[in-house]
A protein has these predicted regions:
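Terminal, low-structured helical/coil segments at or just beyond the last alpha-helical repeat
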Residues: 25-26, 241-291
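Structural marker of alpha-solenoid helical repeat scaffolds
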Residues: 54, 88, 122, 156, ...
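N-terminal leader/linker segments that initiate helical-solenoid repeat arrays
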Residues: 18-49, 53-55, 59, 64, ...
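Structural signature of tandem alpha-helical TPR/SEL1-like repeats
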Residues: 37-50, 71-84, 106-118, 128, ...
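Helix-start (N-cap) detector for alpha-helical repeat units in TPR-like alpha-solenoids
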Residues: 24-26, 59-60, 93-94, 127-128, ...
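Bacterial N-terminal signal peptides
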Residues: 7-16
Length: 291
C-alpha cells in the first residue's frame, strides 16, 4: 500500500509539474502575442522561442513563430516552424499554406506545390493558397497551371492587386500579351504607387515592340522609385533604339549610380554605351569645328 501511495504521489507531482510548465509556456506565448500587436517583433520572437522550449508540442506558438520569422524575411526558419506545426496539426490548412509559401520563397517549388495542394484540399477557396500555388507554378515555368490558380485568386479577391500583378506577369510569359496588359492595368488601378507594377507593364509593352508605351511606363516607374536601377537601364536601351542619345546617356548614368555592382554584365554594357556616346559627341564636335 505504501508503495502504491508513493507512486501515486510521484504521478501527481509529475502531472503538476507538466501543468505548471504548460501554464508557463502559455504565459510566454500570450506575452509574445502582445509584443506582436505592439510591433516589437524581436521581443515576440524571444517569447515564442521560450514557449516552444517549455512545450515543444505547442502548435499555435510554432505557427506564430513561423509568421514572425517570415515577417523578417527569414523563410528558412519560418519553414522549420511551419513544418513542426503541420506535424502537430496535419489538418491545419493555414499551416500548410504558410509552409508552401515559405518553400516557394526558398525556391523549393516541388515541396511548395505539394503543401499548397494539401492546403487547397482542406480549404479550396483560400486566396493565399491559390496565390502562392500560382507563384510556385510560375517559378517552375508551368504558366498554364500558374494562370489557372492566379485567375482563381483574382476571383476570390478582385480588389487585391497582388493577384492581378502575378497573373499579369504569368500571362506575359505566354502569347497572351493583351491579357497580361489587362491584368497589370487592374493591379495598377488598385495600387498606382507601386513602381514594380509600372515596370512589369513596360516590359510587356517592350516585348510587343510598343516603344512609346514602354518608355512611358518606365518613366512612371522611375518617378515612383527614383533609385529603380533596372528601369533606368531599360530606358537607356529604349532611348538608344530611338537614337535619342542625350536621354539614353542620362538613363545609363542613373543606372550606374543606383545599380548593383553584382550585375556586372549590365554595368559593363552601360559603361561601354556611355563611352560610345562620348566618342560620338567628340566626333560631332570635330566635324562642327571643321565646318
Amino acid at each position: 500500500m505504501r508503495r502504491l501511495a508513493v507512486i501515486a504521489a510521484l504521478g501527481l507531482a509529475l502531472l503538476g509539474s507538466v501543468t505548471a510548465q504548460a501554464d508557463e509556456a502559455a504565459g510566454h506565448y500570450n506575452l509574445a502575442l502582445q509584443y506582436k500587436r505592439e510591433g516589437n517583433t524581436s521581443a515576440a520572437i524571444g517569447e515564442c522561442e521560450t514557449a516552444v522550449k517549455l512545450r515543444p508540442d505547442y502548435a499555435a506558438a510554432h505557427f506564430t513563430l513561423g509568421n514572425l520569422y517570415r515577417a523578417q524575411g527569414d523563410y528558412a526558419r519560418a519553414a522549420g516552424e511551419y513544418e513542426k506545426t503541420v506535424k502537430l496539426q496535419p489538418k491545419d490548412a493555414d499551416a500548410h499554406t504558410n509552409l508552401g509559401a515559405a518553400y516557394a520563397r526558398l525556391k523549393r517549388s516541388d515541396e511548395a506545390i505539394r503543401e499548397l495542394e494539401t492546403a487547397l484540399d482542406l480549404k479550396p477557396d483560400d486566396y493565399e493558397a491559390q496565390l502562392s500555388l500560382g507563384f510556385a507554378y510560375k517559378q517552375q515555368g508551368d504558366y498554364k497551371h500558374a494562370i489557372e490558380h492566379l485567375q482563381k485568386a483574382t476571383e476570390l479577391q478582385p480588389d487585391n492587386p497582388q493577384g492581378w500583378a502575378n497573373l499579369g506577369v504569368a500571362k506575359s510569359k505566354t502569347d497572351d500579351k493583351e491579357g497580361a496588359i489587362v491584368a497589370l492595368k487592374k493591379a495598377i488601378a488598385l495600387k498606382s504607387e507601386d513602381a514594380d507594377l509600372h515596370f512589369d507593364l513596360a516590359v510587356v509593352y517592350r516585348r510587343q515592340k510598343n516603344t512609346d508605351a514602354a518608355i512611358a511606363e518606365y518613366q512612371v516607374a522611375v518617378q515612383k522609385n527614383p533609385k529603380f536601377a533596372k528601369a533606368y537601364y531599360d530606358l537607356g536601351m529604349m532611348y538608344s533604339q530611338q537614337r535619342k542619345n542625350p536621354e539614353a546617356r542620362a538613363a545609363f548614368e542613373k543606372y550606374l549610380e543606383y545599380g548593383s555592382h553584382e550585375d556586372a554584365g549590365y554595368r559593363k554594357d552601360a559603361e561601354e554605351r556611355l563611352k560610345a556616346f562620348k566618342g560620338t559627341a567628340s566626333s560631332d564636335g570635330q566635324v562642327a569645328h571643321a565646318k
